[in-house]
Amino acid sequence: ALSIASLRTHVDFFSIGTNDLTQYTMAAGRENPSVSEYFIDDHPAILRLIELVVMESGTKPGSICGELAGRVDVIPKLLRSGIRSLSVASALVPDVKFAVRKIKVEDSINHVGIEK
């Protein structure tokens, strides 16, 4: 996530896997009961890393995959960060589409709402 500027000339797009990003950033695995409480995929640090990837990616399109992409409560923040593609389980598609359609894109550009 922090090296996207040096990688962007070598890729056509980027995809952020939020499960792995969260696990490595928070040093906590979802399946490990002794640390799973620290697996917080909508933590401000995770949202800031997503925003940094989008900002540093230039004109390369970006996508989010992982459990976070299907959380309708977080979708507005993801869109505000500049993400325009969400990869979710097929069962979540109707709810995600409904959540996205409720948001005005012009109100959701380049601001996650966290302090920098």
Where are each of the predicted segments found?
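Conserved alpha/beta-domain cores
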Residues: 1-116
